[in-house]
């Protein structure tokens, strides 16, 4: 009598799933600590706790040895248009038609809106979220878009927008996959 083992994926994962799952946050601006302060020298600030700085790209270090699918969550802190996501390492990109998102949501992108894009094998999707409702937003990807995967090693991931880049924050999540023990 023969027994067969059927798996949903041919890849190995770390025994402790928490150690194999990763999330990397990258935002287009990093907010700083703030409070009301009356500066006696208005021309030259005397109390600085932080600076806003552009961080629209990050290097994601992928430690697996097989290409990995990703889930990209894009948070909107306000209006934005023409949002694009690139993996420069693999020369792949996602172009988001924000006019189509506006059509699906009933108005232009605003603070609190979110997109989730999954390149999972057998689980590809684009979802838009507003006010607790979920919308199928696959139609918002243009015909030249690719699904974003990570390759072993360093992956340069960049987020851009035609307008409102300071209102875009992103997190990329992935799981380390291995082809053999």
Set out the residue ranges of the language-model regions.
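Short, small-residue-biased leader/transition segments that mark boundaries at the very start
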Residues: 1-6
